[in-house]
Amino acid sequence: MSSLATVSQSEAAQSPTWRLNQPQLQRLPDPVDKAFMEVFVARQAIFDRRLKVYGYELLFRPCRDCTSADAAGSAASLQVITNSFLSIGIEKLLAGTRAFINFPQDLLSDERAFSLPPKGTVIEILESVKPDPAVISACRTLREKGYTLALDDFSHLNGWDELTDLVSIIKVDFRATTIDQQQALASRYSARGIRMLAEKIETIEEFHRACEMGYQYFQGYFFARPVIVSRREIRGNKLGYLRVLKEAHRPELELFALEALIQREVSLTSKLLRYINSPVFGWINPVQSIRQALGLMGEQEIRNWISLAALPTLASDKPDELIRTALVRARFSELLAKWAGLGHRKADLFLIGLFSLLDAMLNRPLAEILAELGLRGDIADALLGTGRPDQPLAEIHALIRQYEAGDWEALCRTAARLRVPKDIIVDLYLEAIAWSDQIFQESILSH
């Protein structure tokens, strides 16, 4: 790649090395509390009607108990959860929202629960809990301490008044109930001032139906599902950004062609100049043109930056959580590369994570988008699930999806095949979230 820059080489040599996929973040304290390092923790978003994140359900599982059915049901699990809050700050997972945490019956009366911060903690009472006097008393105490209570997987219309009088939220599993049941539950409990949460919402149609029924909160992967439309319906900036992405990911980068495409997108030009002139580079003279900026960036940095900068426009009509999820996947994939012996493929793994939700952003089949961008081979195979399941890139992508879903048994099997230590995975996940939060706030992602 020939340089287009007019900034002097000596000036460039004096600038600090900083890459979008290697930000200057504080790593987790070392050593981290052993109890924390031995637990997996994942998050699943809960949305309001405007598709803003209301909170996250946190999923915990001790690493050593990958195959244990009741690993989350013991008092020891509460110790792990409270240690996690105290020693590492699980609030870093919450982005200023609320934590929904599952409580089986034996944890409701455990006084260690009071070490969890009442503000922003929603205690989910599992469906296996029976509303006996001890449970009612424990729930009343938790409520008096300031905790918000929610009933999980609830389907009772009668006989639970003493417990439902204490809760603020009722979760209804849309995979385990009929439409009639969903409506009846919403009608009965909304009338009593209880907020209804529709769980396991998988399509945008289900989301709209739940809204019409009176549900206020929604959990599931519906926000990451594409609503397929015809190619000609993709207009304006999205189409322009797709052209830039396609040019950036050609095997041979043509800077003059890329410069011409970027010039057509005023917002992308502005983002590029803000990025290259950020204080972290420390240029003596400001960079004033696209040509200069591209000349100062390496090929991989150009590709990564354009991919990142394109996300807000491609997902402009989608929930912010879609962008956050793509960013977490990208960084998580890249961090796992080293531990899986794939350091030489970390840029490809970063791209796989970043592009894994392009179909939802553009409402087009992913295979069609990847073909247009010219992405083939094991990168496309990993994204489409069309290659051998034992391909390393596909395995890492599968591990990340398993982590997101809290499929701990599958995760442990995949980690073993990749020879990735189980106890490092949560560290990498939290680092990926911290990085995504930083990038999300950077000016390169502003509209």
Q: Which residues does each predicted region cover?
A:
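Amphipathic alpha-helical segments in well-ordered regions
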Residues: 80, 84-88, 146, 357, ...
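Bacterial c-di-GMP phosphodiesterase EAL domain
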Residues: 4, 15-120, 127-130, 134, ...
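Long, contiguous hydrophobic alpha-helical segments, chiefly transmembrane helices and signal peptides
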Residues: 40-47, 53-60, 80-81, 99-103, ...
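Coupling/switch/interface segments within P-loop NTPase motor domains and analogous charged loops
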Residues: 1-9
